[in-house]
A protein has these predicted regions:
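N-terminal alpha-helical scaffold/docking segments in eukaryotic complex subunits
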Residues: 1-63
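Amphipathic alpha-helical scaffolding segments comprising HEAT/armadillo-like alpha-solenoid repeats
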Residues: 1-5, 28-40, 61-76, 95-107, ...
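Alpha-helix N-cap/helix-start positions at coil->helix boundaries
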Residues: 15-16, 45-49, 80-81, 96, ...
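Alpha-solenoid HEAT/ARM repeat scaffold
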Residues: 16-19, 49, 53, 84-85, ...
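Conserved aromatic-histidine-acidic binding/catalytic patches
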Residues: 39, 43, 90, 110
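Structural signature of alpha-helical solenoid repeat scaffolds
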Residues: 56, 91, 123-127
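Long, hydrophobic/aromatic-enriched structural stretches that serve as scaffold segments
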Residues: 73, 77-81, 85, 92
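Charged/polar, low-hydrophobicity segments characteristic of intrinsically disordered regions
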Residues: 89, 123, 152-155
Length: 155
């Protein structure tokens, strides 16, 4: 099944999410990622949450699947559930490019669930920092953001 056909099937909420179709979303890049992002905004809101939950679940069960580009692209989605799942999906990512957006979610997202998911995904980087595997400035940014959030009364 082509990506275009699969995206069209995603529109139909009466259809179950197909495992094989979702696997096509692994390692999306370039034009395919661009097309998927454009189609994403026309999907029904409940369907978006279903898709993201399923992708995170697939990622946990199949380590070889890489939905990082999808997660990164959807960190700023309007839907709290989508942002939460996108942040959760990055828990295994060790690419420093996700540090800044995760810190942004941690510090400014209106949803406590999204902020918690961002903090959880940043935890991997704190481990890498302690092991000397990421830049000091990145580790310092993460530490400062976490300490700032911990110091806030409502958190």
């Amino acid at each position: 099944m082509t990506l275009e056909k699969f995206v069209s099937e995603l529109q139909d909420e009466s259809q179950p999410l197909k495992h094989a179709g979702l696997l096509q979303l692994s390692s999306l890049a370039g034009e395919d990622l661009y097309e998927f992002k454009n189609a994403w905004y026309s999907l029904p809101e409940p369907r978006k949450g279903q898709i993201m939950s399923k992708l995170v679940e697939l990622n946990e069960d199949h380590a070889e699947m890489d939905f990082t580009a999808m997660y990164r692209a959807l960190l700023n989605d309007e839907n709290d559930d989508v942002r939460e799942q996108a942040a959760k999906g990055l828990w295994e990512c060790d690419d420093r490019v996700v540090i800044r957006p995760l810190i942004g979610l941690l510090k400014k997202d209106p949803s406590a669930r999204v902020r918690a998911a961002a903090a959880t995904s940043l935890a991997k980087f704190t481990d890498l920092f302690q092991q000397g595997k990421i830049l000091s400035r990145d580790g310092d940014k993460i530490r400062d953001a976490l300490l700032e959030v911990i110091g806030e009364e409502e958190e």
